[in-house]
Amino acid sequence: MNVTLESLATCFQGLVPAMLFTCSQDGVPNAAYLSHVDYVDARHVALSYQFFNKSRRNIAENPHALVMVPDPDTGQGWQLRLLFVRSETEGPLFERMALRIEAIASYCGLKGIFKLRAADVYEVLSIEPSAEEPATSVGTRFHPTRGSGLPHAVFTMKALQDLADRIQRTDSLESLVDAILAGLEESFGFRNSMILVPAEEAGVLVTIATRGYPQNGSGAEARIGEGIVGLVAEARKPIRISGLMRGMLYAYAMHHGSQDAQPAALRRRIPLPGLPNPESQLGVPLMVRGELVGVLCIESDSPYRFHEEDKSSIDLLGHYLAIAIQNMQLHEERTTESVESLAIPSHAAISAVSSPDTRAIPTRQVVYHCADECIMVDNEYLIRSLPARILWRLLKTHEQTGRNEFTNRELRLDKSLKLPDFKDNLEARLLLLRRRLEYKCPDIKIVTRARGRFALELGCELALSTEP
């Protein structure tokens, strides 16, 4: 049987544990579980050097080893006879393997605890089918994913074209991000996804669109370098993990820290939406000419949702979506400036919002906390940073003048908002603010009137106040 490493690409996803067998110089064998075997090239694989000190000592004495890997599509096990070649502590291979380990640890809140010491590269001397089903030998009940009726996202040209056609029909950032996530579900079968963009605060990403989650994630933040999303942004490389829950078992077992009450500054954050027990995660950096436009995150409760053959298509998809988002942001900024230059609303031309029935209108207590630059509505956190400053400016202007219509241009000209001079992403901030209000405080609405023009609509009375 002529079997190549390329034909076993699906075995190197880490879905089912592999087994590593080594032997000391005096003939004492040792067996250890491996979470992941990494494909290097047509003749080599790499094993992570982390915890298996006995295996490492044996290899130093006797460079021959045997590893058993399962095929997650068929359940067939394969024996790879190996010869140790070298250890790498830097370079693309080491970085790729270290990033996967760090992503799983960071997902558990244990970033920095699990470190890859080296990527040990082995030459594959022979490949033989295993007589024993490897999934049974490691105590894992195996369910093949192909041919079982489970959906598999195949990145065909037709699916990519369908998504591109959907994107071409959008005319705003809001419709674009919604079309992207809807297309990922309808064309590729990805039901749970979100898009994050860089926030005003350095080192932070903020969620502007989600799909498939019961909780509204608009405004949810991820710090760069933390969690899978943050690591994707930091490394600017895709992270694709299969069998995530199994990979997290060890990390959870090591986590004995107490869950102390969080300080107020941390409570004033919106948690990222997510599946309670994700089995697969995919994070894709959205890059344009070296600039991070955002991060696309996709989750699944299927252990083997993202396949090896999809890797190139995933990279291509990320580049296309990044260009689409950046072009839409530039398009909205330029067109709103040209439209707004024709007419800027005057105070006299715009009346305050009135309600046809004021008998049952509630009063909302809206408090702006200056130190944290955040807004609380009826003692519940709403939003912070630039979107909070924008909303506070709109509410105070309405309170003082009765105005309820505004333009993007006047916000850009308002120095008190402290918008960046270059690429302020104002449209993304307004989208975030609008969706956050829809979820947490529907009595306050920001309604688009025309490109670059919007209205503040109130279904409540406001009691505005500030806190240091």
Question: Model regions: which residues?
Answer:
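Short amphipathic alpha-helical recognition elements used for nucleic-acid or partner binding
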Residues: 380-414, 433
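Helix-loop-beta substructure at the N-terminus of cytosolic sensory domains
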Residues: 170-208, 216-217, 328
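Short boundary/linker motifs that mark transitions into or out of structured domains
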Residues: 336-388, 392, 444-447, 451-455, ...
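DNA-recognition element of transcription regulators
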Residues: 383-391, 419-440
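Signal-transmission linkers at sensory-effector interfaces
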Residues: 27, 136-174, 207, 293
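A short, aliphatic-rich beta-strand micro-motif
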Residues: 270, 279-287
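Regulatory loop-to-helix N-cap segments in sensory/regulatory domains
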Residues: 216, 276-279, 293, 299-316
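Regulatory sensory and allosteric helical modules in signal-transduction proteins
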Residues: 208, 215-274
